[in-house]
């Protein structure tokens, strides 16, 4: 909750993190505040909040993306397709407060939120989400 009388703000007190909404058909514990691009070559920016213990299914996005962790701790596991289905591609990556992660377009991954997280998420062009199996 924001405090408009404070001289200084942070992730706990800034109005940036107010007015988040839930979105149908998204994982439990996820809320966001966003604006949608009017320029088809632009980027889409979302301010995301995830509750500790929330998880995103294995998925991909059609554009490159960048995640900045403002508060909390999360992890990402990349996957690749094989004859036996999806298999982990490398070690699980951990992102902590202050870290920035980049994911290439169409790279298959999951996301797990170890602590309550506040994220700035930037997606190249219009956002898309494809669940992978």
Feature annotation, model-predicted:
Residues 81-105:
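Short acidic-glycine-tyrosine-enriched beta hairpin
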Residues 96-97, 102-130:
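Ligand-binding loop in jelly-roll beta-barrel domains
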Residues 1-47, 92-93:
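A short, N-terminal "cap"/entry segment at the start of jelly-roll beta-barrel domains
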Residues 63-83:
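Glycine- and acidic-residue-biased ligand/ion/polar-headgroup-sensing regions
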Residues 55-57, 72-78, 100, 127:
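Short beta-strand segments in beta-sandwich/barrel cores
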Residues 44-61:
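Conserved short histidine dyad/triad with adjacent acidic residue
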Residues 47, 70-71, 115:
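A cytosolic small-molecule/anion-sensing beta-strand core signal
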């Amino acid at each position: 909750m924001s405090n408009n009388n404070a001289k200084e703000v942070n992730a706990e007190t800034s109005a940036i993190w107010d007015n988040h909404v839930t979105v149908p058909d998204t994982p439990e514990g996820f809320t966001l505040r966003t604006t949608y691009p009017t320029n088809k070559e632009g980027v889409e920016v979302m301010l995301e909040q995830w509750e500790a213990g929330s998880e995103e299914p294995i998925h991909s996005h059609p554009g490159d993306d960048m995640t900045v962790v403002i508060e909390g701790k999360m992890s990402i596991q990349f996957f690749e397709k094989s004859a036996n289905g999806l298999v982990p591609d490398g070690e699980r990556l951990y992102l902590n407060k202050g870290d920035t992660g980049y994911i290439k377009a169409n790279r298959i991954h999951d996301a797990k939120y170890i602590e309550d997280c506040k994220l700035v998420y930037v997606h190249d062009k219009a956002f898309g989400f494809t669940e992978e199996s």
